[in-house]
Amino acid sequence: MFDLFEPERRAINQLLVGLRDEIIKKDASVRGFNIGMNSGDAAGQTVDHAHVHLMPRRQGDVPDPRGGVRGVIPAKAAY
């Protein structure tokens, strides 16, 4: 994200908003989203290009949604 030009950042934001609207339209059970992007080796980036994860969330899909996506797969939460 930090290496992108402003028009690219705006395009990503527009894409995320459009995808959000499309997902909610198709699935009314979606109540929120996690948006993820790793930037740099220390942050866990494993591919050498910008990419964004948009994860639809539903009420009660995990016991406690605090902490974001780390708790979605309990066996993988502590890493």
Named regions from a protein language model:
Residues 1-79:
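HIT superfamily nucleotide-processing domains
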